[in-house]
């Protein structure tokens, strides 16, 4: 699924999550790709019969209307779409007004279950599960003093376990022969490696089917001894992607490991976002091919000067088009999501009417794509994504050229 599709899907779920209904009036119907449409229609007719017995007149009327609306939509399908579909229907409150909505959602992944659900809100949990980051890497950093095990989930690093060793230092205590001391030290190292292997198994085996790979970091020869000694469970051992030199073996070591492994993790979003922002900041620092802020970036897009558009997934603004009902004059303004402040037409002194309202991230991305520009979406879960959002207003661009006489 592309970044843009993922963003659109996420925004749709956010919109549906806001809707509330009375009692159990909101219907959510999950239809898997292999479900027979005729069987679904038959069950809905049965639900229609049962809904006729609902005591509350208003609830009964709204539930019956919702089921009828879904049945009407199903008439247009001989079979479910490739990934199945989810149909939502019911009377919701939108800006203080009640409105009956019916929508069909074709999710990015196969619908996992058949379910007919009535509640005061739409049942979205299986759809939200599809938004969870699928790229998962195991992280292990160790030396002979301590070890930390963690996960890289898309952009986030999570510590799963940490422990210290009982391995003595290299200098023996008085009264011990050097040979005996070295033997005891080797036994302690071996026991610690076993302990780290068990710690990794306990922390990472539950994720083994989802793990893309495992990265091991630490000083030499510790990480090599640990890996080559096969202290890891065989299911984890075969997933090791590489060994990397790191100076820290606590939580900060996990971050250092991800940085050192960036060639291996080139496609992981945390590295992708870091590289994009470094490229952008380099241009900003030398007053080069960079632009930020909606107005400036929009101007460069329209001039065909944008090479890569950087957008924050957390922007919640809309581009609204208004038209004067008398003279037909049109204006476009950007407002915070949900804000309704129609401007006045100065010539006719009347309030303008809303014609169109679009999510600004989608509007700008489509405008940029129409000029051949690349579009990159950054979340605020990474430091770089947060910088884009807070320092540059969530909208920035790397330019092909500066049409106004710059570089």
Curated annotation (Swiss-Prot):
Family: Belongs to the eukaryotic release factor 1 family.
GO molecular function: translation release factor activity, codon specific
SUPFAM superfamilies: L30e-like (SSF55315), N-terminal domain of eukaryotic peptide chain release factor subunit 1, ERF1 (SSF55481), Translational machinery components (SSF53137)
Record function comment: Directs the termination of nascent peptide synthesis (translation) in response to the termination codons UAA, UAG and UGA.
UniProt xrefs under Pfam families: eRF1_1, eRF1_2, eRF1_3
UniProt subcellular location: Cytoplasm
NCBIfam families found in the cross-reference section: aRF1_eRF1
Keywords on record: Cytoplasm, Protein biosynthesis
Database matches in InterPro entries: eFR1_2_sf, eRF1_1_Pelota, eRF1_1_sf, eRF1_2, eRF1_3, Peptide_chain-rel_aRF1, Peptide_chain-rel_eRF1/aRF1, Ribosomal_eL30-like_sf
Name recorded for this polypeptide: Peptide chain release factor subunit 1
Originating species: Archaeoglobus fulgidus (strain ATCC 49558 / DSM 4304 / JCM 9628 / NBRC 100126 / VC-16)
Domain of life: Archaea
GO cellular component annotations of the record: cytoplasm
HAMAP family, sorted: Rel_fact_arch_1
Taxon lineage: Archaea, Methanobacteriati, Methanobacteriota, Archaeoglobi, Archaeoglobales
Subunit annotation: Heterodimer of two subunits, one of which binds GTP.
């Amino acid at each position: 699924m592309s970044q843009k599709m993922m963003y659109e899907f996420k925004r749709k779920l956010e919109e549906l999550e806001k809707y509330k209904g009375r009692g159990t009036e909101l219907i959510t119907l999950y239809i898997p790709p292999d479900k027979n449409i005729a069987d679904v229609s038959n069950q809905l007719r049965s639900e229609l019969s049962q809904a006729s017995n609902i005591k509350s007149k208003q609830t009964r009327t709204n539930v019956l209307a919702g089921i009828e609306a879904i049945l009407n939509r199903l008439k247009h399908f001989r079979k479910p779409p490739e990934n199945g579909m989810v149909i939502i229907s019911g009377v919701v409150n939108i800006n203080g007004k009640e409105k009956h909505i019916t929508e069909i959602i074709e999710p990015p992944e196969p619908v996992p279950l058949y379910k007919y659900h009535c509640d005061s809100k739409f049942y979205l949990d299986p759809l939200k599960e599809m938004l969870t980051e699928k790229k998962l890497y195991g992280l292990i950093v160790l030396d002979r003093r301590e070890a930390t095990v963690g996960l890289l989930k898309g952009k986030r690093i999570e510590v799963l376990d940490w422990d210290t060793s009982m391995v003595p230092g290299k200098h023996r205590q008085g009264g011990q022969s050097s040979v005996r001391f070295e033997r005891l030290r080797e036994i302690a190292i071996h026991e610690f490696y076993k302990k780290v292997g068990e710690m990794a198994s306990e922390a990472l085996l539950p994720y083994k089917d989802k793990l893309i790979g495992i990265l091991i970091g630490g000083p030499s020869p510790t990480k090599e001894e640990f890996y080559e000694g096969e202290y890891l469970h065989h299911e984890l051992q075969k997933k090791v992607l590489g060994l990397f030199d790191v100076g820290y073996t606590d939580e900060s070591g996990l971050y250092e490991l991800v940085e050192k492994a960036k060639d291996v993790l080139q496609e992981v979003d945390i590295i992708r976002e870091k590289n994009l922002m470094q490229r952008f900041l380099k241009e900003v620092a030398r007053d080069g091919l960079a632009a930020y802020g909606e107005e400036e970036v929009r101007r460069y897009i329209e001039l065909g000067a944008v090479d890569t558009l950087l957008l924050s997934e957390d922007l919640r603004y809309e581009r609204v088009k208004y038209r004067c009902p008398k003279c037909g004059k049109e204006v476009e303004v950007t407002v915070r999501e949900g804000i309704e402040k129609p401007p006045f037409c100065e010539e006719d002194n009347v309030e303008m009417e809303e014609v169109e309202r679009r999510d600004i991230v989608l509007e700008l991305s489509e405008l940029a794509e129409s000029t051949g520009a690349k579009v990159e979406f950054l979340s605020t879960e990474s430091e770089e994504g947060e910088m884009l959002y807070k320092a540059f207003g969530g909208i920035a661009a790397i330019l092909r050229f500066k049409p106004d006489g710059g570089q």
